[in-house]
Amino acid sequence: IKLHNIIANISLKALQNDSINAAIKRLSVDEQSGFELRKLSLKVIANNKGMKIENFAIEMPGTEMKMDTIRMEYDSLKALNHFADNVRFSFRTLPSHVTLNDISAFVPALSNFKEKLDLNIDVEGTLNQLNCRTLEINAGDKFRLKGDVSLQDLSRPQDAYVYGHLTNLSANKEGIGFLVRNLSPHYNGVPPVLQHLGNTSFHGEISGYFTDLVMYGLFRTDIGSVQTDLKLSSDKAKALFSYSGGVKTTDFELGQLLGNKQLGKITFNLDVRGNHYKSQYPSITLKGLIASLEYSNYKYENITLD
């Protein structure tokens, strides 16, 4: 780590063996990897039983985040040696927006996300038993995420477990473009198959580890709905993304999705298993029943895949 352009204005009002009263009026710094902290300010009051952080605000090139009072509770100062399990805290964001590219020095995968997101979160618990009672992420009317999330063992990312209930995850046509544009390393426009979905939304649950997530719920689009019960897995060492589970739909407009006028609606209940290795064609296996498929103005029924 190499820091430069450091500007600091720190006020220490009181310091004793078991208490502190201090304020960071301004702290700004640049890091050689590209991270730029334009301003950090806060006031902290702490003793051997707890800590209170007020007026917390942080600014980066595309981020302005403010928080209500951050409160921490612990049995003694020794608890700080085991912060992840023994320090209970709570905080709530005030109106804030973030640009994920601002932290790409630490999370390179976010380097393409250069547009702002409005953020509203309300958190309580310990680092290893965290409950996010409110989670709202919006990009105007284009994209919305609303729900609540519980996280376990965040101090050990490889073992971290997440459970989330999504009451609203939605994107309109412009929102799909927003996501593709900010998540794609090489943006070449929105693929037609995604454009054809129209307005989309997902209501359901996610659970599992960051490398093995189960997604259960209903995915709605302008051309039909799909019920999903899928496990999504990733293996960076093998450059592999895989998925398996069940998908079913009734009268989904397959022809509109693929831009094929010969195809019409499809109804199916299938088990799917797919493997996607980097720089290779995907391998997909389907088993189950296609109850009906319209093709060239004729309906085919009861097609079994095994």
Question: Where are the model-predicted features located?
Answer:
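Conserved two-metal-ion catalytic palm core of "right-hand" nucleic acid polymerases
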Residues: 148-149, 232
